[in-house]
């Protein structure tokens, strides 16, 4: 199989003779360093290769790239890609020009090389790995190039597995893959948590499967179940998408177990394509386990002179008097943005993603603003996405928001990476993010395809110091223009902004358990770096002045033990049978190398250093100036 792909790639080498970045398969740390430097520094003309890729618009190219890289999808036929696949891209999906990551990865992947690619989300990575995956299957079984050709597909003869960190991203990849194989006999199935396993197995056994897209947990479950009927004895390609994210959320063990269920690559060679937005040490370790170090190419599309989204998009931080000021200030911001979109013809329609630190807070925010929408018709429709929803509900919400012209999506971090929501005008984050990287990934949901956007961070005063320490080196400006942010809600004589009463009215109709869940979720570690006693006092003020409760919600004994000796908590008289929702992720430390670097014989280590050279991350001692 592998030989046939290499032979096919060899037939088109004449068409690639002008390619300056041709890489020998001979392993050499020095050679890899030289090539990655060339890839990182040598910029392609912006007119030829658009920086961003999205489903709603594909940038047009007027001239061929000067360095000889294939930049048009129609030219894939010259590389041996089957005409049915090319037609699906150019006619079915309407794409003409490749993005940079597509141009730089498809060609070497078609030659059979393993790929380690550092590329940002929203740059067309999905199509970049789907094309070689599909073509390799067709090369292995030419009858599958046609819709009704070949033998009936089976569930125990999977040829490619694509692993994604989230259900939403896996579903998105599966949807794109089905568009690509529409004119072929290749069958695509998805396997994600939050859906009925038996229903997926029944469908897969009935239809068969050539490409299986899934999340690590569900894939490990299926492959480890000897009665599932899911197997991949002739697996030819393995794809790891958003590798850094999979490791961040703790899927390392599942990934290791999945590999144990796959054929030994020493007996049955397979191609591995690994994509990651960042290349920290744990990703390098992952690559070392999965990638053939004698036959791989490291592609880096993040350049030293590139203006990144978090450097380009205007960003503002709004310090608030207390937790109870956050929703009124957010409502004020939304109303101002709506007015701007109505009066400024050049402004995007208001379409916002609001990131909140816990699942319970996502549910509460959506419930409150949904009631505000019923009362004030100018407030756009709202949705929420979080881990407590079924996969069908999450997919429905994502699709509706994606297709909406205007709206507000309240979300936990399940949508922070990978999901492509077009024309998002605002990303609003409440409370301090778990780390600088997550702040940047959330912000990346706006400003896509070089469109305008804004980032807003709304934090109470007790989190301001932690925000300064956690978010250095970012162009975040302090904004004190929102009136609701500075109001002292505890002052009964104060002339409060009307938004405070609007929020109280909406909260008065919410169920008691929702307040208890939200209150407890903040005590579960969602806000690291905040003094526990100050946090309890702040939450009690929120309960009284923001939710209108006479006393704070009672908490379980286990939370009391976790909090230690703090004042102001009420304890439940008996253990509640239902656990609070969404305790939220804790702060994760970063393990960046320190001290002078030395040249290594390990090509993966050199790739790491080259990638980290472009990450202009400030030192830990620096603080933001807002």
UniProtKB/Swiss-Prot annotation:
Positions of short motif DEAD box: 241-244
Organism phylogeny: Eukaryota, Fungi, Dikarya, Ascomycota, Pezizomycotina
Any GO BP: RNA splicing
Domain Helicase C-terminal, chain residue ranges per copy: 329-493
Membrane-traversing stretches: none
Domain comment as written in the entry: The C-ter region (residues 578-626) is not directly involved in DNA unwinding activity but functions by tethering cyt-19 to structured RNAs, so that it can efficiently disrupt exposed, non-native structural elements, allowing them to refold.
Gene this protein is translated from: cyt-19
Superkingdom as given in the UniProt entry: Eukaryota
Residue sites binding ATP per the record: 119-126
E.C. code: 3.6.4.13
Occurrences of domain Helicase ATP-binding (ranges): 106-297
Source organism (scientific name): Neurospora crassa (strain ATCC 24698 / 74-OR23-1A / CBS 708.71 / DSM 1257 / FGSC 987)
Top enzyme category: hydrolase
InterPro entries attached to this UniProt entry: DEAD/DEAH_box_helicase_dom, Helicase_ATP-bd, Helicase_C-like, P-loop_NTPase, RNA-helicase_DEAD-box_CS
Localization of this protein: Mitochondrion matrix
Protein activity control: Activated by exposed helices in a group I intron RNA.
Region feature Disordered, mapped onto this chain: 569-626
Chain spans, region RNA-binding: 578-626
Entry's Gene Ontology cellular component terms: mitochondrial matrix; mitochondrion
Keywords associated with the record: ATP-binding, Chaperone, Helicase, Hydrolase, Mitochondrion, mRNA processing, mRNA splicing, Nucleotide-binding, RNA-binding
Composition skew (Basic and acidic residues), residue ranges: 607-617
Protein name: ATP-dependent RNA helicase cyt-19, mitochondrial
Molecular function per GO: ATP binding; ATP hydrolysis activity; RNA binding; RNA helicase activity
